Regions:
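Short, polar/acidic, helix-capping and beta-turn segments at strand->helix junctions
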Residues: 2-128
Length: 128
């Protein structure tokens, strides 16, 4: 049976979707954009600032569910410009290393709210 989860500390959804859906021990985290949780606006400062905010947001939401980035099995990274690939990789490595989840990265024409990066995760609960 699935359980829908809505964050109370991370950025609010900008559409009709759950922050995450839990099914058994699997957690499907919706795509996270670099929105400031307090304002809902995309952070300024370029791709590094945006990628950092995405992973901070993910950490906040996972923490609400008793999880960490170590629970991640698969990440999907969406970029509006593949020229940002190296910069995002450097930040990604700081948050996930050295036991990286499986990952895909794709370039897309646009992301919600003018974001340059979005990340979704599939995680595994190790307890309960």
């Amino acid at each position: 049976m699935k359980q829908c989860f809505l964050t109370t500390n991370g950025p609010k959804a900008i559409g009709p979707y759950s922050t995450a859906v839990i099914s058994g021990k699997t957690v499907y985290l919706s795509g996270m954009i670099p929105a400031d949780p307090a304002t809902g606006k995309i952070v300024e400062g370029g791709i590094e600032a945006q990628a950092t905010q995405v992973f901070e947001n993910i950490g906040t939401v996972l923490g609400e569910m008793g999880l960490t980035l170590a629970n991640a099995l698969k990440a999907t990274v969406f970029l509006t410009d593949l020229n940002d690939f190296a910069a995002v990789n450097a930040i990604y490595e700081r948050y996930f290393g050295p036991d990286f989840p499986a990952r895909s990265c794709v370039e897309v024409s646009r992301l919600p709210a003018g974001a340059r990066v979005e990340v979704e995760l599939i995680c595994e609960k190790t307890e309960g």
